[in-house]
Amino acid sequence: MTPLNNDRFLRALLRQPVDVTPVWMMRQAGRYLPEYRATRARAGDFMGLCTNPELACEVTLQPLERYPLDAAILFSDILTIPDAMGLGLYFETGEGPKFHKAVRTEADVNALKVINPEQDLPYVVNAVKTIRRELNGRVPLIGFSGSPWTLATYMIEGGSSRDFRRAKEMLYNQPEVMHRLLDVLAESVIVYLNAQIRAGAQAVQIFDTWGGALSHNAYREFSLKYMEKIVAGLIGEHEGRQVPVILFTKGGGQWLDAMADTGATALGLDWTTDIAAARARVGNRVALQGNMDPGILYASPERIRAEVGNILAAYGQGSGHIFNLGHGITPEVDPEHAGAFIRAVHDLSAQYHTAG
């Protein structure tokens, strides 16, 4: 395989010395970029973009043409797994993802089978291969999946939800059915991420977008337990390198100690967590990724730069920090402001790294 020209993202994940703090953005290939909107229009719709490996590759690389990012992330959607299970994913303008079929009963759960990524999601596997080839060693490629709990919420609700009423009804009234659903999803995530790794992903992230909606005990039983199972089932080394695993629970700051015990390489932090306190708690066990409020990108470039400086200072000296937003970049952000953010990370972080 082509050697990496820039491996600081992988080095920081392993808490090895770097010259500057690496940076990438969740949803860095997205609607804030005019070139993304043009490619999406050519694809016809969002699913047309996701299911075309060449176009998925094109939009994955677009932010790297604009910005000195330290990683690329596969362009896809977390809901590909339930779609592959036959639920019929579609998107309604202004309403987000929906499924033609929801999972509401024990019979619905029992009918689900663990996916076969090469057969059921060949467009994802082919997109990873295509992106990796086109990157040609420029930066590492991140693969990803949704967490079992997060996938389950969409499957049970039939789409997005504010209160997760149906999902919580199943969780509390039929916990054994919920566990069965989460188990088939965990097994599916394992084979899905391993397929991405074999196709060329050099690190993977598990997005637990809705873990923070759970109570303290329910989070451990219905979300964290399954992410720990996934981490244990992943390919640990590929192409002669360790394959780092990033766990990101939005709203999960109170569970960092338990998350660090899963065997994950790094934990994603949202912007409600104090990164200095997080490093003091778990920084000797895991790298940390985050955690600027995406809303700051609406402010002036000077204010963005100041906030980057604040977060770098809070993390402090040494490696083990991957700079990111605390959640995905939003569609209305000025691309120039995103550029100011990325440049500020590299400009201001060198002082915190004595070896490179």
Swiss-Prot record:
It comes from the Bacteria. Gene3D superfamilies: 3.20.20.210. It is found in: Cytoplasm. Substrate binds at R27, Q28, A29, G30, R31, D77, Y154, T209, H327. GO terms for biological process: protoporphyrinogen IX biosynthetic process from glutamate. Its EC number is 4.1.1.37. InterPro entries: UROD/MetE-like_sf (IPR038071), Uroporphyrinogen_deCO2ase_HemE (IPR006361), Uroporphyrinogen_deCOase (IPR000257). The keyword Lyase applies. It catalyses: uroporphyrinogen III + 4 H(+) = coproporphyrinogen III + 4 CO2. The record marks D77 as: Transition state stabilizer. GO terms for cellular component: cytosol. Pathway: Porphyrin-containing compound metabolism; protoporphyrin-IX biosynthesis; coproporphyrinogen-III from 5-aminolevulinate: step 4/4. The keyword Lyase applies. It holds the Pfam family URO-D. SUPFAM superfamilies: UROD/MetE-like. PROSITE patterns: UROD_1, UROD_2. Keywords: Cytoplasm, Decarboxylase, Lyase, Porphyrin biosynthesis. One of its GO terms (molecular function) is uroporphyrinogen decarboxylase activity. Homodimer. Belongs to the uroporphyrinogen decarboxylase family. Catalyzes the decarboxylation of four acetate groups of uroporphyrinogen-III to yield coproporphyrinogen-III. PANTHER family: METHYLTETRAHYDROFOLATE:HOMOCYSTEINE METHYLTRANSFERASE RELATED, UROPORPHYRINOGEN DECARBOXYLASE. HAMAP family: URO_D. NCBIfam families: hemE. This is Uroporphyrinogen decarboxylase. It comes from Cellvibrio japonicus (strain Ueda107).
